[in-house]
Amino acid sequence: QWKNDAGMKPFDEFLTKYFPEGNRIDGSVMYGYTVAQGLVQVLKQCGDNLTRENVMKQAASIKNLELGGLLPGIKVNTSATDFAPISQVQLMKFKGETWELFGEILSGDVGG
């Protein structure tokens, strides 16, 4: 269902090049790829300062990061007081052979 999604194309290209035997429908493969995308962003934010202190600081300073392995519109945000990277949800229902998204993206934050 997501084969032609813009976020899936880089994933498919990555697997074709680096992990051709990888199972594209295995959730753990997608999870690993998505987490690695987040790490790449943290390292970019670090610049040349790759100390543990700065890596941790940048990991706690992610703002509105969209990753190809997440549903469209779901964003990663962290702060010094909130390390949970994902606090949004998208409702969907199964329609015979595919999942259909419906409604707006909802906040999973308490009181959100």
What kind of feature is each model-predicted range?
Residues 1-112:
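Extracytosolic ligand-binding ectodomains
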